[in-house]
Design a protein with these regions (language model features):
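Acidic/glycine-rich phosphate/pyrophosphate-binding loops and surrounding catalytic core
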Residues: 2-212, 217, 226-234, 239-242, ...
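Short secondary-structure boundary segments
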Residues: 221-222, 245, 267-268
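Cys/His-rich Zn2+-binding cysteine-cluster or related metal-binding knuckle/ribbon modules and their
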Residues: 249
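Short, charged, intrinsically disordered terminal tails
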Residues: 267-283
Length: 283
């Protein structure tokens, strides 16, 4: 995923407006406008770096005269104590931009690092790791960028780029067959070319989908490892397969060994810890 420059700029401007408001009175009150300073961002724990260009843009939009020097790139592994970037310029401006820049980098690096951990757990299998739509409001593109930076694959971005027939869709539509037929009719009538994924809750629902057809991918929702193995055998590579629900770091390899094409993990974006990064004055 490539982040649009205009999107990033507007996102950062909103974040700065939220934080700075009418002014950074703490800095304005005690630091002369002529005071210059240097600072460095230090990793206080190992991580996968993510958000470097965004941090650079935060400082640029705060004060175009700040000199930002990146020392690592997104996707690189940082060790505890590594310096990720240096900045030089107005001391007050550096302090004004500090928290917004760190908020982006700490969260995005946390997502990238968590994703990398999960990807490493299923290394050696053919299964690929997907994210979900369980993202922070207005942060989805950034968080999905972080997932990709960590080695994961982006699932659909929103409700508009893929059909996902979940349990509630099926129930409201009057069953699996009705949901599929209505969807196929809608896509044809509106000249839309979208892939269809359908969620099944047990092996009986899976058999109904297999008998009916008309989809591209089948999501095995909250299946046990044993039932996942049976499901993969029943599907026999006729459709893409995805395991979802209840997948953790402890059991993800067991699911991957069942032979599913994808495993989606909501925790990549909604249950992560931000990375501990600290901006320190530099000599």
């Amino acid at each position: 995923m490539e982040l649009n420059e205009q999107y990033i700029e507007q996102h950062i401007l909103s974040a700065l407006k939220e934080d700075v408001g009418e002014g950074d009175y703490s800095s304005l009150a005690c630091i002369p406008s002529t005071e210059r300073g240097k600072a460095k961002l230090v990793a206080k724990q190992a991580c996968v770096v993510c958000g470097m260009d965004i941090a650079c843009k935060v400082f640029e939009l705060t004060d175009k005269d700040i000199v930002f020097t990146p020392l690592m790139k997104d996707g690189q592994n940082a060790e505890k104590g590594d310096v990720l970037f240096r900045v030089e310029g107005s001391a007050a401006s550096i302090l004004t931009a500090e928290r917004t820049a760190l908020n982006y980098m700490q969260r995005l690096s946390g997502i990238a690092s968590t994703t990398a951990e999960y990807v490493n757990l299923i290394k050696g299998t053919s299964t690929r790791l997907l994210d979900t739509r369980k993202t922070t409001p207005c942060m989805r593109l950034l968080e999905k960028y972080a997932v990709k930076t960590g080695g994961g694959i982006n699932h659909r971005i929103g409700l508009y780029d893929m059909i996902m027939l979940k349990d509630n869709h099926i129930d409201f539509a009057g069953g699996i067959e009705n949901a599929i037929d209505k969807t196929l009719h809608y896509l044809k009538e509106n000249h839309l070319e979208l892939k269809i994924e359908i969620e099944v809750r047990d092996l009986d629902e899976l058999r109904r989908v297999l008998a009916h057809g008309g989809v591209n991918r089948i999501m095995l929702d909250n299946f046990s490892v044993e039932d996942t193995r049976k499901a993969v055998e029943l599907i026999a590579q006729r459709y893409e397969t995805e395991s979802s629900g209840g997948i953790t770091a402890e059991n993800i390899l067991s699911y991957a060994r069942c032979g599913v094409d994808y495993i989606s993990v909501g925790a990549l974006t909604h249950h992560i810890k931000s990375i501990d990064l600290s901006l320190l004055t530099d000599e």
